[in-house]
Amino acid sequence: MTTTIKTLIHKSKMSIPRLALTGILAGAATLLAAGPGATNEIEQSHDHTSAVPARLVDLVRVYTQQFTNVNAATAANYQPLFGCVTGPDQGAMGVHYINLTLYADGLIDSSKPEALIYEPSNGALRLVGVEYIVDAATWSKNNTSPPMLEGQAFQFVGSPNRYGLPAFYELHVWAWRDNPNGAFVDWNTKVTCEGQ
């Protein structure tokens, strides 16, 4: 077991039993160590400037490995909403598969992202990232400051917005597709909706 995995296990404050977390992390480490030719599901070249982004991106990969196949996402109550989201000049976000139960619970848990983001490509969907989302009014009932995850602050999106939703907080994590502008920036210039 690598030092990185041991450190993640030791520092983990998640509610997952350590034995299960050890197995998940060991499997992810094996996949990552195999290199970019081992799978077409993961882009290996992510670049992070500190340990915090790398840790959160790595955790997201571990927790969402099971959702690289979109059928697993739908089986876990994630459903596509809003179609493929694209920006005029910032790239795209992709197709958001949202778990409405997780969205409505008012909680933030790195192991349970509210949305899985897929990029359409040649009639298939490729997992590229996740989005943590919490309704602002629900969050404010029990919290006095905006949400944070592994030291990363969420962005506030007011209402009205392009989605027709009440105000919410959100955090994108581009764990499966490198984003030249940063792992937590909303728009990813490497993601496109053209492959639908």
Feature roles, as predicted:
Residues 20-31:
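Bacterial N-terminal signal peptides
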